[in-house]
């Protein structure tokens, strides 16, 4: 009972207390703060090379804002602001900024009545975009260990830095010369083959351009040649076994007469001339004169004879001595049919020269009319091995012989030469006169003739025969296909009793039209599926 009385007493006391506090409170209609609220959600958007936009959420009751912008600053706001702006809305476009520059911006909400009640600053940091005045790299600009950068001449720039694109590490820095600045061009070295890089152009530490590139395959030991170089002079000063690696572009051999006349490069040492890119071959205008036993290799180049000052052959041997190989691979050679230089032929040997081998493979040879000479023409020399393999040869030797090889065997100890004509597409050659010879071969070493192989060729649209010479050996014929070969004696056997020495391909005959894809444009893909299955002609 005692406990119940205590609880009852406490409850009654609490009830009286609550009743005493039930007087109504006044309604709060206005709150006055010590200062304006700072802008919130401040951010920089649409940042370009010279502009940016600041946005923020408007502060309640605020009509004006003050903005300060500091250049080359990272939220320290030291020194004098670059510019100050007063606006009455929560967005502002900043203009006339400097490219690739760090900026700090801050915004204050202003109290219209009492500056002491202005808000605290809201701050933001941003960086303007770098410029892009570098032009794109051409194939010619990028080497295996170097690169050439270009930009508009006269721009204010002072250095280039190259970074490894994968790691971001700085690889090399190059200080621009006055000549570089004037010409808008700089050559940077010290790189590695087949590596991804980013090159950046600067002015006072600010980026004015950036381009990425990948260096090409290793050209160790090669002399890199660009179309702006004096290639003729480089050939004149060549050293033994020098390799010239050419970018795409046009290289005119000097020495010709007239404005457009291309001359002849004298090759008197073993050298290699190769194009760097198979799909963008450099074009050489001119010819080659071989002397003093030189060897010459041409790979991935175009040789244009249409501008030559002389219509002499592309390769002319001039001194009587022993020569290294002439190697031609994946090239294109052409002359003019009428307008331009109408070439005499492809090579010419009219001196007592011994040539280790002439190898012509994987190439396009066309429009060498042969005005004044035969196509492959050896009058007084000795070619140990002549190999013509996997080429497309068309519109050549209009009224002349294909291979001429006169008998100078006594001058060389009566050797037996080797001739291999394999896997070629030969179209519209020896088609201007009847009875021209594919093999006008009379070099009769040891009175045993020659070793000749004619295999897997596709021969079309010709009036030629193989030969009519008693000293031409019967070739070994294998799997050759013919179309529109109008002289039946191309297939005829010899009849020595009647002094007829045809030595023709008796296993061959005129077949169906191979239906070349577009011969007028040099496209000799065989569209006739039945013939294509025979694997005859150039396989490209």
Kindly label every feature range from the protein language model.
Residues 240, 254-301, 510, 516:
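Beta-solenoid repeat scaffold
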Residues 94-116, 188-209:
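Beta-strand-rich modules
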Residues 469-540:
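Acidic, glycine- and Ser/Thr-rich low-complexity intrinsically disordered tracts
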Residues 22-61, 99, 114-155, 193, ...:
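Pro/Thr/Ser/Gly-rich low-complexity, intrinsically disordered linker/stalk tracts
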Residues 217-258, 528-538:
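Acidic Gly/Asp/Thr-rich repetitive segments characteristic of extracellular carbohydrate-active
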Residues 294-305, 323-337, 355-369, 383-398, ...:
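Right-handed parallel beta-helix
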Residues 66-100, 112-113, 161-192:
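Recognizes extended acidic, P/S/T-rich segments that occur
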Residues 259-262, 283-289, 307-320, 339-352, ...:
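Extracellular beta-strand/beta-solenoid scaffold signature
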């Amino acid at each position: 009972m005692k406990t119940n009385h205590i609880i009852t007493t406490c409850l009654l006391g609490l009830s009286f207390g609550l009743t005493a506090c039930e007087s109504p409170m006044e309604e709060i209609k206005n709150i006055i703060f010590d200062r304006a609220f700072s802008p919130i959600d401040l951010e920089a958007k649409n940042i370009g090379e010279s502009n940016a936009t600041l946005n923020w959420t408007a502060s309640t009751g605020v009509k004006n804002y003050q903005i300060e912008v500091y250049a080359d600053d990272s939220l320290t706001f030291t020194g004098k602001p670059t510019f100050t702006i007063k606006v009455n809305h929560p967005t502002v476009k900043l203009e006339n900024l400097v490219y690739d520059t760090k900026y700090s911006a801050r915004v204050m909400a202003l109290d219209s009545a009492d500056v002491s009640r202005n808000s605290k600053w809201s701050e933001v940091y941003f960086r303007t975009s770098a410029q892009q005045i570098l032009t794109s790299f051409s194939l010619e600009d990028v080497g295996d260990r170097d690169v050439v950068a270009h930009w508009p001449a006269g721009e204010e720039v002072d250095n280039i830095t190259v970074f490894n694109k994968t790691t971001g590490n700085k690889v090399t820095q190059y200080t621009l010369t006055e000549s570089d600045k004037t010409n808008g061009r700089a050559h940077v070295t010290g790189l590695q083959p087949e590596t991804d890089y980013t090159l950046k152009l600067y002015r006072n530490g600010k980026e004015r351009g950036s381009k990425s590139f990948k260096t090409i395959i290793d050209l160790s030991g090669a002399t890199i040649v660009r179309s702006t170089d004096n290639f003729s002079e480089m050939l004149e000063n060549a050293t033994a076994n020098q390799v010239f690696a050419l970018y795409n572009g046009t290289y005119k051999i000097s020495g010709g007469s007239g404005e457009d006349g291309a001359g002849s490069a004298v090759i008197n040492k073993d050298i290699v001339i190769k194009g760097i890119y198979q799909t963008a071959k450099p074009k050489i205008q001119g010819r080659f004169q071989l002397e003093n036993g030189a060897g010459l290799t041409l790979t991935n180049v175009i040789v244009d004879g249409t501008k030559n000052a002389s219509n002499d052959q592309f390769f002319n041997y001039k001194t009587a001595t022993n020569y290294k190989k002439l190697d031609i691979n994946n090239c294109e050679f052409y002359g003019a049919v009428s307008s331009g230089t109408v070439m005499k032929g492809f090579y010419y040997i009219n001196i007592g020269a011994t040539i280790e081998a002439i190898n012509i493979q994987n190439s396009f040879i066309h429009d060498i009319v042969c005005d004044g000479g035969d196509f492959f023409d050896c009058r007084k020399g000795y070619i140990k091995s002549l190999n013509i393999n996997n080429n497309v040869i068309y519109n050549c030797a209009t009224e002349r012989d294909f291979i001429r090889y006169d008998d100078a065997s006594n001058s060389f100890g009566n050797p037996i030469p080797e001739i291999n004509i394999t896997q070629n597409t030969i179209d519209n050659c020896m088609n201007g006169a009847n009875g021209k010879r594919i093999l006008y071969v009379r070099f009769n070493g040891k009175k045993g003739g020659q070793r000749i192989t004619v295999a897997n060729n596709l021969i079309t649209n010709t009036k030629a025969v193989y030969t009519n010479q008693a000293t031409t050996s019967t070739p070994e014929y294998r799997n050759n296909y013919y179309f529109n070969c109008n002289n039946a004696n191309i297939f005829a056997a010899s009849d020595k009793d009647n002094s007829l020495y045809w030595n023709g391909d008796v296993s061959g005959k005129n077949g169906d039209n191979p239906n070349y894809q577009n011969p007028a444009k040099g496209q000799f893909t065989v569209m006739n599926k039945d013939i294509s299955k025979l694997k005859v002609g150039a396989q490209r």
